[in-house]
Swiss-Prot record:
Keyword field contains Amino-acid biosynthesis: yes
Gene: trpC
Organism of provenance: Campylobacter jejuni subsp. doylei (strain ATCC BAA-1458 / RM4099 / 269.97)
CDD domains (UniProt xref): IGPS
Name of the top EC class for this enzyme: lyase
Catalysed reaction equations from the record: 1-(2-carboxyphenylamino)-1-deoxy-D-ribulose 5-phosphate + H(+) = (1S,2R)-1-C-(indol-3-yl)glycerol 3-phosphate + CO2 + H2O
Protein name: Indole-3-glycerol phosphate synthase
Amino acid sequence: MILDKIFEKTKEDLKERKLKLPYDMLGRSLASNPFFPKDVIKALKRVEKEVKIIAEVKKASPSKGVIREDFDPLSIALNYEKNKAAAISVLTEPHFFKGSLEYLSLIRRYTQIPLLRKDFIFDEYQILEALVYGADFVLLIAKMLSMKELKKLLEFARHLGLEALVEIHDKEDLSKAIFAGADIIGINHRNLEDFTMDMSLCEKLIPKIPNSKIIIAESGLENKEFLEYLQNLGVDAFLIGEYFMREEDEGKALKALL
């Protein structure tokens, strides 16, 4: 499965990064970090009919290959911010998504809205990295982690002042997210194991989610009417990437959905 391949490659990369920059040295670099985590909950919590979008900076994906040839991460991020994105998701996985932590750092220096580090995170080191490079929240994929691991990473993120978006795809993932104490739950319509889509997933899972949680819908979102339908089900915000990346003007495409 592709998820296993990504996970293994991420583990190899992480081992190398830890050798180059040990945990304590990474932590010390926070002393010169001028950025403090922003209020992610406030940014994503829906207010009445307001449409909140986490717009994604994404060059490629394992299923589609390169999505955006003329890829300028900072220009894309600034266009998103100008067109009222609630937050920006930055892919930092280099092999399958052509992302980079440097993109995150660059975007942080020139934007004011919350940033999500989107990667395959399973180690506290990666969460500390996210903070050092300017993220305000991190992606944790429930499918990749045991409940104990998920809980530990959630608690560590909060200890650093970061939030976590816990991504789920089925009832088992949801149980894990709730019992681990997730505040922000992302329902991914795409199954990461085989890339099939189930656009009815929010309808199936939202009734099982406590009202206190912030709910994010992910994948396959490109229609304003469908976004309104999901809002009526209880979705707070939407994570959209590929649709914007295929448009000539990603900012204009974003604005059209608001």
